[in-house]
């Protein structure tokens, strides 16, 4: 498609929740009839703030600009608010950035992965979640996924080792099933929240993987997510203990505020490390990559600003022997899923892709979702990102907003904790 004097004419935010999770999609329209792009701007925990950022700030900034000038729009968009690299504006910018890549692909008549250099592989290996209340339930769920063809699984007991509930009796019951590990008691007048005992969790994880390796062997790859919920010293001890179980990687063992501890962890353990789900700036990975402190970049693409910074991060990682592991939870839209996978296909240092199964409503609202077959994802070869949105159907699933209960985490004595 060849178009002269192409301009952005409209920018809008589409909020929808067909999977039960609030999603934000940016649609950029142009003066060429029928030519538009879609991008993911989902920050579920602050969905209406992102919508406001797009509608009130990004839209006026974009209208009248040439949509093919992706790099210039990204760079000027980042600095346009002076203060930069916050998750709300980054997600807003991500929605714009992905939509511009979608438009560029449609203009070129090529999938985005071809614009990024072309395919490096034929399919995208996926890992899925296999949670359970105890070792046997996790094992059963893994066996079910193996029958579906998955070769990589993330293994968790309850909510990152706890029960994902504020019912202390249920937590105690579930942890008791995990080889009689008892969580600490809470004081009187318990503050509402999701209670989690990091010490009981840290004791239960090695027993989980001992059970799984004894029952399932070493023919399946295991991932575990610490979710930054333990002290740095506990994380180091956990990584050391888990070496014998040969994890594919241990995710986010420390909080972003404690990344200096990764040097000590690296000195004491050979367990592969994935880090960065909560990072909001590509430069946060630089010292970890430069000092060989991680094996995988664990990156939420929309929170760093979209495809433009993500492809640079992937290349920098490649030059230093670090592989990609883009974040793929349920709280990114199918548009964001496709953006991840275009990066996956075109990155020689691809490591693995997290995948959360989509229900029928999601696939109905977003035609063009990836095909999933025997643990692999396959994108179509349509120009751009290859995915669309049915706005009328999307409107049938309004967003609710609010604070997700799982983020209201507390330790047994009632102290607020990282979720």
UniProtKB/Swiss-Prot annotation:
Reactions accelerated catalytically: D-gluconate = 2-dehydro-3-deoxy-D-gluconate + H2O
Cofactor: Mg(2+)
UniProt-listed SMART domains: MR_MLE
Site (Important for activity and substrate specificity): 329
Keywords recorded for this protein, A-Z: Lyase, Magnesium, Metal-binding
Keyword Lipoprotein: no
EC numbers: 4.2.1.-, 4.2.1.39
UniProt binding sites for substrate: 45, 129, 277, 298, 327, 331, 354
Family (UniProt): Belongs to the mandelate racemase/muconate lactonizing enzyme family. GalD subfamily.
Record protein name field: D-galactonate dehydratase family member SEN1436
Species the sequence originates in: Salmonella enteritidis PT4 (strain P125109)
